[in-house]
């Protein structure tokens, strides 16, 4: 699972996702890509599941680039805890994804192999996505 080695602060505010992505919305490494169409938090487990699905499907051919990184900690309180007594401890990491963001890129394979591999990764994502070609 992906997570930062160290951060400046242990906990973050939730924030809000408005507008479209202005960074990371063009293909820059491979030839084929998976692009987000909705805003969401994507967990490090979901990113890893998508990456594994793509590598298994493509087998030894091609190269895969993961274009998002989970750098936001999500805190959780223990179950059946009374209100108050501070914010919970960080449990997992998420990547904040806005519409237009490239999630994965792929190169060195034919289009139908890339399409199949990327559709498997798309099924692991909690949002609607689209397959794009540079």
Swiss-Prot record:
One of its GO terms (biological process) is translation. Its main location: plastid. InterPro entries: Ribosomal_uL16 (IPR047873), Ribosomal_uL16_bact-type (IPR000114), Ribosomal_uL16_CS (IPR020798), Ribosomal_uL16_dom (IPR016180), Ribosomal_uL16_sf (IPR036920). It is found in: Plastid, Chloroplast. It comes from the Eukaryota. Keywords: Chloroplast, Plastid, Ribonucleoprotein, Ribosomal protein. CDD domains: Ribosomal_L16_L10e. Gene3D superfamilies: Ribosomal protein L10e/L16 (3.90.1170.10). One of its GO terms (molecular function) is rRNA binding. GO terms for cellular component: chloroplast; ribonucleoprotein complex; ribosome. The keyword Ribonucleoprotein applies. Residues 1-22 are annotated as: Disordered. Part of the 50S ribosomal subunit. HAMAP family: Ribosomal_uL16. Belongs to the universal ribosomal protein uL16 family. PANTHER family: 50S/60S RIBOSOMAL PROTEIN L16 (PTHR12220), LARGE RIBOSOMAL SUBUNIT PROTEIN UL16M (PTHR12220:SF13). This is Large ribosomal subunit protein uL16c. It comes from Nicotiana tabacum (Common tobacco).
